[in-house]
């Protein structure tokens, strides 16, 4: 038998009834006096409960011989040895207490660590649930706290002012163009309308991205460029697997792609991941003919307009929608264009109807700008200077000065001489001061520049460029101008060629 405290054979063995363990009597009694508990189970224990064990004569002799042999083997003076033995027993008792305390603290620490880990798991689970719930939070909060149309328009106005305050936009200068490279023809779907996307670069100049799309084999194939050197081709699966083709495709900020399908159903697609972000059905009885997402002003919403003049802003993230102008019964628009400050929207049709809407004043009637019914409007542009509205017609160029009374021209209506043959297509850059015209008769590109002094267009005789004689007859053109140079996109009914122009 060994003492549970000292680890030695007890000279006077006793038994604790609580733990049923053997101890040295003096050590156990001292422990009970100090703590009042059993050393092993830590249950309450009194000295009276301690059971003394009376060893047999053989056991007593063995114990005495063991202790005596130990003492005599190490010490020579019996009294000193007895004192040392008592000190040793006291040390062992203290050591046992410390071990017990250490074991208790270790168990408590283990419990605390376990509870801490459990708390972390619970917190992580709650955080995951919070993140899941937060996805629906904007929608529910938007419904709970209704934002009025007036408050929305105030936000639109302030966002526009902040953008304008950043400074005046710069436009790259056109060099004298003497060389060209005609790139290989590509097919596109003419019935899919695309709108140029403007992106502000570090030089405070708007890069205009022109996009052509071909819908084929369940995929949308995009070719887009902002100058003669930056040409990209992207293919993304058509979100509509039933064979439906989009009627309008327009880019928005943060890699968003807006796809309008029949029935005024809009799909918002992430152009990087090809993931469908949202499906929206616009509640309008009329056909949507324009949609666009400004990348600097009011970037949480995109604008749409239908052929009767209903104009609305739709949130990318939820069902929030604000109608800023209601439909008319006496017009039928075919397209539109948004001013750079996002406060003016021009809606027009080929038969000479051109109305400009002030988006910050929904109660204000639109302004009708006079265009000859026979002019056949092809495209309307707001120039980068902010106050010119350029109207490209079949045979004439009309430019209005928005700073003056409605209908005031910035310069006299201009007709290019070659237009008399009816075989020329042209486009004007976003500055409103550079024009490229292509003649199907001579297969040549001609540059025209606006002269401030004479307020007229002049032909740049040094920039006449000829294409090969077997080039197709082109019916439409887009011009882009960026840091990488100037390019013209010449289009037929089903194909296009990119012409890179260099000094």
From Swiss-Prot:
Q: Any one cellular component term from GO for this entry?
A: mitochondrion
Query: Pfam families attached here?
Result: Prp19
Q: Where in the cell is it found?
A: Nucleus
Q: Which GO terms describe its biological process?
A: DNA repair; generation of catalytic spliceosome for first transesterification step; mRNA splicing, via spliceosome; protein K63-linked ubiquitination
Positions of the WD repeats?
328-367, 372-410, 418-458
Annotated GO MF terms: identical protein binding; ubiquitin protein ligase activity; ubiquitin-protein transferase activity
Q: What class of enzyme is it?
A: transferase
Major location, coarse class? nucleus
List, for all copies, the residue spans of the domain called U-box.
1-71
What keywords appear on the UniProt entry? Answer: DNA damage, DNA repair, mRNA processing, mRNA splicing, Nucleus, Repeat, Spliceosome, Transferase, Ubl conjugation pathway, WD repeat
Q: In which pathway does it act?
A: Protein modification; protein ubiquitination
Domain of life from the UniProt record:
Eukaryota
Under CDD domains, the record lists: RING-Ubox_PRP19 (cd16656)
Under which EC number(s) is this enzyme classified? Answer: 2.3.2.27
Annotated stretches, region: Required for self-association: 57-144
The record makes one more remark, namely: Present with 11700 molecules/cell in log phase SD medium. The tetramer is an elongated particle consisting of four globular WD40 domains held together by a central stalk.
Assembly: Homotetramer. Component of the NTC complex (or PRP19-associated complex), composed of at least CEF1, CLF1, ISY1, NTC20, SNT309, SYF1, SYF2, and PRP19.
**Family, as annotated:** Belongs to the WD repeat PRP19 family.
The function of this protein is: Probable ubiquitin-protein ligase involved in pre-mRNA splicing. Acts as a central component of the NTC complex (or PRP19-associated complex) that associates to the spliceosome to mediate conformational rearrangement or to stabilize the structure of the spliceosome after U4 snRNA dissociation, which leads to spliceosome maturation. It is also probably involved in DNA repair.
What protein name does the entry list?
Answer: Pre-mRNA-processing factor 19
Organism from which the protein derives: Saccharomyces cerevisiae (strain ATCC 204508 / S288c) (Baker's yeast)
């Amino acid at each position: 038998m060994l003492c549970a405290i000292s680890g030695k054979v007890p000279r006077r063995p006793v038994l604790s009834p609580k733990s049923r363990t053997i101890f040295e009597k003096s050590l156990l009694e001292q422990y009970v006096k100090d703590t009042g508990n059993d050393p092993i189970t830590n249950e309450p224990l009194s000295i009276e409960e301690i059971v003394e064990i009376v060893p047999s004569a053989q056991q007593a002799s063995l114990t005495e011989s063991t202790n005596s042999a130990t003492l005599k083997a190490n010490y020579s003076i019996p009294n000193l040895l007895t004192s040392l033995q008592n000190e040793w027993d006291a040390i062992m008792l203290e050591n046992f207490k410390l071990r017990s305390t250490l074991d208790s603290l270790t168990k408590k620490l283990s419990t605390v660590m376990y509870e801490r880990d459990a708390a972390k798991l619970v917190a992580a689970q709650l955080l995951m649930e919070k993140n899941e719930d937060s996805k629906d939070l904007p929608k529910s909060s938007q419904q709970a706290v209704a934002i009025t149309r007036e408050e929305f328009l105030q936000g639109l106005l302030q966002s526009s002012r902040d953008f304008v305050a950043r400074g005046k936009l710069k436009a790259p200068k056109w060099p004298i163009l003497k060389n060209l490279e005609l790139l290989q023809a590509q097919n596109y779907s003419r019935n899919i309308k695309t709108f140029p996307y403007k992106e502000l670069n570090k030089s405070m100049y708007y890069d205009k991205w022109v996009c052509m799309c071909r819908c084929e084999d369940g995929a949308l194939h995009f070719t887009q460029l902002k100058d003669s050197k930056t040409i990209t081709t992207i293919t993304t699966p058509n979100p509509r697997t039933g064979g439906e083709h989009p009627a309008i495709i327009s880019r928005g900020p943060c890699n968003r792609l807006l796809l309008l399908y029949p029935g005024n159903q809009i799909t918002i697609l992430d152009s990087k991941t090809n993931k469908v972000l949202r499906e929206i059905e616009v509640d309008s009885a009329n056909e949507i003919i324009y949609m666009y997402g400004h990348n600097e002003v009011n970037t949480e919403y995109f604008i749409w307009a239908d052929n009767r003049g209903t104009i609305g802003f739709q949130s990318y993230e939820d069902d929030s929608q604000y109608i800023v102008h209601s439909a008319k019964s006496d017009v039928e628009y075919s397209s539109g264009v948004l001013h750079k400050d996002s406060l003016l929207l021009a809606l027009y049709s080929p038969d000479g109807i051109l109305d400009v809407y002030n988006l910050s004043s929904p109660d204000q009637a639109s302004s009708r700008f006079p265009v000859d019914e026979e002019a056949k409007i092809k495209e309307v542009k707001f120039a980068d200077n902010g106050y010119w509205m350029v109207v490209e017609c079949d045979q004439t160029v009309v430019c209005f000065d928005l700073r003056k009374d409605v209908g005031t021209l910035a310069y006299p209506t201009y007709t290019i001489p070659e237009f008399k043959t009816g075989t020329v297509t042209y486009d004007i850059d976003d500055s409103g001061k550079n024009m490229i015209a292509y003649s199907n008769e001579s297969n040549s590109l001609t540059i025209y520049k606006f002269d401030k002094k004479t307020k007229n267009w002049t032909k740049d005789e040094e920039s006449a460029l000829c294409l090969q004689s077997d080039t197709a007859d082109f019916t439409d053109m887009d011009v882009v101008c960026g840091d990488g140079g100037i390019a013209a996109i010449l289009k037929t009914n089903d194909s296009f060629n990119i012409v890179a122009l260099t000094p």
